[in-house]
Amino acid sequence: YRRHFGPTYYAFDMGHTHYIVLDDIIYHGAKKYEEQIDSMQLRWAAAYARRLPAGSRVCVAMHAPAMKSWLGNRVMESAVPLMEAFAGHDLHFITGHTHLNSNFDIREGVIEHNVAQICGNLWWDPINWDGTPKGYQLFRECGGEFSWEYRNLGEFPARQIRLWGPGEVAKHPACAVAKVWNWDPHWTVVWY
């Protein structure tokens, strides 16, 4: 890849948003790897951050998530100096790897969009393991506003929820379960 295309980290601007792509998989061979950002990329990203006007919107795209909600909201060690470098900016992480779809506030001014797989659960199941259908995340910038929407393949964009009745979800047999693909902590949920 590097020989033909160049570094595995780079940046570009689209509209008023600055996008940074980082390689946060350090491969050791024999299917062994670490989920971290190496020091060379961290230095490069910090230098890039210093050139941006205060309050800029920045999206950092990388494979593994910056925060692992299933491990008590543990933040990737190398993501901490990255967030510090972009302090004072509107920072969004766009990540994958987990086969689920979620949006988390990591800290003030930092949101992570962990996007489910477009292939579902590794091609053999059209639903990711958290109930999100196979699809993709659409990020939009319009009039200075930034928004995101999950698009499930083969269904209308307005469909953003799947419901299971009591007895259909083994982990919660007495409950009705709702999976809203793109819920985030800023939504207001109203039960009727």
Question: Model-flagged regions — what are they?
Answer:
Residues 66, 99-100:
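Alpha-helix capping/helix-boundary segments
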Residues 63, 96-97:
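Active-site glycine-centered loops adjacent to acidic/histidine catalytic or metal-binding residues
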Residues 23, 62, 180:
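Short beta-strand/turn micro-motifs composed of small residues
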Residues 188-191:
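Short beta-strand elements bearing conserved aromatic residues within extracellular beta-rich modules
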Residues 1-54, 73-94, 100-142, 146-149:
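Extended active-site neighborhood of metal-dependent phosphoesterases/phosphodiesterases
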Residues 174-183:
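Short edge beta-strand/loop segments characteristic of extracellular beta-sandwich folds
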Residues 49-70:
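Short acidic, glycine-rich surface-loop motifs adjacent to enzyme active sites
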Residues 142-174:
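Short, compositionally biased P/S/T/A/G/V-rich stretches that sit at domain boundaries
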